[in-house]
Amino acid sequence: MSPLSIVLLGFAMSTDAFAAAIGKGAAMRRPRWRDAVRAGLVFGCIEAITPVIGWMLGRAASDYLAAFDHWIAFGLLGALGAHMIVAGLRNESEVDEALRDTPKRYGLLALAATGFATSIDAMAVGVSLAFLDVHIGVVAAVVGLCTLSMVTAGVMLGRALGALIGKRTEILGGVILILIGSTILYEHLSGAA
């Protein structure tokens, strides 16, 4: 996986968290930098850990699935991308549900619950990464840093932007995941030909 693909993956994986952060920022009277960075750290850590868990699960099964690994990566990334696009086009998403279920006071537990709700897809991406020649530590660090920056910015921008761009980030993230999955499949099939 190229460095550009890893960075794009990091930003694609952080779009759900960014949308949630915009919602949290919009719900706060006056978001402070301290609150925004705290949210970014919580989301970033969770978003960095979940692909590692998925990667470990994928590695455990990789010997049995090696002949189909490129199709699995393509299928998982494509399905997740399509899901994100559909959620972005609908009025409601997992992010909206997570926001509804969290209290108005955004304590650490509420942040962690929302962080886990928005990082389930990162675990599935981690499974697909187990079949690729990629250093999972680098990917996890990039995903965590992208999420940290996107969530911090999202909380601060939330008051001004609100619902205007929240859904569009999910759509963009979905398109990026589909493109990465398609690139993996293309590279494998063209290399095998």
From Swiss-Prot:
Superkingdom classification of source: Bacteria
Keywords noted in UniProt: Cell inner membrane, Cell membrane, Ion transport, Manganese, Membrane, Transmembrane, Transmembrane helix, Transport
GO molecular function terms attached to this record: manganese ion transmembrane transporter activity
Localization per Swiss-Prot or TrEMBL: Cell inner membrane
Subcellular location, principal: membrane
Transmembrane segment boundaries: 3-23, 37-57, 66-86, 109-131, 146-166, 171-191
Database matches in Pfam families: Mntp (PF02659)
InterPro entries documented for this protein: Mntp/YtaF, Put_MntP
A cellular component term, taken from the record's GO annotations: plasma membrane
Membrane topology label: Multi-pass membrane protein
Keyword check for Cell membrane: yes
Family assignment from sequence similarity: Belongs to the MntP (TC 9.B.29) family.
Biological role stated in the UniProt entry: Probably functions as a manganese efflux pump.
PANTHER family xref list: MANGANESE EFFLUX PUMP MNTP-RELATED
Name of the molecule in the record: Putative manganese efflux pump MntP
Organism phylogeny: Bacteria, Pseudomonadati, Pseudomonadota, Gammaproteobacteria, Lysobacterales
